[in-house]
Amino acid sequence: GLGRPSRECIEGSEPCEVFRPYTCCSGHCIIFVCAR
């Protein structure tokens, strides 16, 4: 499913928003949401 990026997931995660330090815990980023 889709999920929101989080600031708490830094290691081993994909950056999601360009101008903010948000990353995806799992899966990959599509624009500003995380897809598994």
Swiss-Prot record:
Role of this protein: Probable neurotoxin with unknown target. Possibly targets ion channels.
Domain of life of the native organism: Eukaryota
Cystines in this chain: 9-25, 16-29, 24-34
Annotated localization: Secreted
Annotated Gene Ontology cellular component terms: extracellular region
Principal location class: secreted
Keyword Flavoprotein tagged: no
UniProt-recorded name of the protein: Conotoxin Cal6.1h
Residues that make up the propeptide removed upon maturation: 1-7
Keyword Secreted: yes
Record remark: domains: The presence of a 'disulfide through disulfide knot' structurally defines this protein as a knottin. The cysteine framework is VI/VII (C-C-CC-C-C).
Family: Belongs to the conotoxin O1 superfamily.
Keywords: Disulfide bond, Ion channel impairing toxin, Knottin, Neurotoxin, Secreted, Toxin
One MF term in the entry's GO annotations: toxin activity
Tissue: Expressed by the venom duct.
